[in-house]
Amino acid sequence: MKTSIFKSLYFQVLAAITIGILLGHFYPQLGEQMKPLGDGFVKLIKMIIAPVIFCTVVTGIAGMESMKSVGRTGAVALLYFEIVSTIALIIGLVVVNIVQPGAGMNIDPSTLDASAVAVYTQQASQQGLIPFLMDVIPASVVGAFASGNILQVLLFAVMFGFALHRLGAKGKVIFDVIDSFSKVIFGVINMIMKLAPLGAFGAMAFTIGKYGVGTLVQLGQLIACFYITCVLFIFLVLGSIAKATGFSIFKFIRYIREELLIVLGTSSSESVLPRMLEKMEKVGCKKSVVGLVIPTGYSFNLDGTSIYLTMAAVFIAQATNSHMDIWHQITLLVVLLLSSKGAAGVTGSGFIVLAATLSAVGHLPVAGLALILGIDRFMSEARALTNLIGNGVATIVVAKYCRELDEKKLDAELSGTNKSDNAATPTAQS
């Protein structure tokens, strides 16, 4: 029994994170030098994301009996994303107004170092609905795969899947080749995931070594407020949605515990995207639903990022004594409903969207970003974890609503009684 525990990815990643924290705290300079380990692991994952999405979406769509179901799945997913992310934005807004973590700080924006956030404000200037939509269309298919742009690859994969489906029997050879290639790709993923503990160790050692635990204490009220809000959102909002759909949020979290630990170590929900595609299909969701919902959710269903954006914006207003009446806050909410859709599931994207939002709202000092620059990295974990759980729940909800969910398989997997699949899960172990 002990041997199996030590061999599990869950234990290995947890141990790696703990060792990384200790190294970063007691030997900060050495901890900072571990950064390449975390970066290298994330780059390996990003290397494989584009082909995984392409294969999953193409085989999922091409293998469907009716094309109408694809359009229905997409429409249901987008509607769900909009409703739940709006709830997340409102919850963040309500909590930050009640707790007021920035009240009493009385900071003069002119004394803040705006140069520290210049790189984010520059990137934020490129944010906007039209540029975002235009960016979804790749200049070339090769460019989409080379850059690893999730939405560009998704767009091409959907079009390719539709075209392959229309070929019917003539396209069977191509379908079989892509399906076989998909199995090879997931074999590569299993190899990469063996390095997950090393990546989590390096990323955590760097974070603690560079920013220090002291940074957490300085603005601890905002961090604590944000983490508690994320927990409440997961168990109250997502938990209620899960219960209404027919499964337990607690069992689902246990089911993806290894992925959650990897995200905790790397601060990027994108680092487990390939594994989530595999696990959501294993839990009973049709491949076509998984292939559409998960990749799209990485831009349109970022619940943790939505909570962070409203809380951070109002915190800056409170700390700098920038008055925000109810109309200002409604304006902020409307702007975030659009700008939050441009955030990807990668570290730092939420900060860029926040910079864009402050610029768009106008009366909030963009220089106020310097206040949370030091602690943004520590809030990134909660954002990524909430985003991951949110996308997983969304996939099951959409699959059930579209009648593309095997509920018996869902119950068996979440209860741990599906022996055949559990036996196959050593891909995530040893």
UniProtKB/Swiss-Prot annotation:
Note the Gene3D superfamilies from the entry.
Sodium:dicarboxylate symporter
- State the compartments where it is located: Cell inner membrane
- List the PROSITE patterns hit by this protein, alphabetically: NA_DICARBOXYL_SYMP_1 (PS00713), NA_DICARBOXYL_SYMP_2 (PS00714)
Its domain of life reads Bacteria
Name the membrane topology term.
Answer: Multi-pass membrane protein
Task: Locate the transmembrane regions by residue number.
Answer: 8-28, 44-64, 76-96, 144-164, 184-204, 222-242, 289-309, 326-346, 352-372
| Keyword Transmembrane in annotation | yes
Alphabetic keyword roster: Cell inner membrane, Cell membrane, Membrane, Symport, Transmembrane, Transmembrane helix, Transport
Q: Which family does it belong to?
A: Belongs to the dicarboxylate/amino acid:cation symporter (DAACS) (TC 2.A.23) family.
- Which NCBIfam families does its entry note? PRK01663.1, PRK13027.1
Stated name of the protein: C4-dicarboxylate transport protein
**Protein's organism:** Pectobacterium carotovorum subsp. carotovorum (strain PC1)
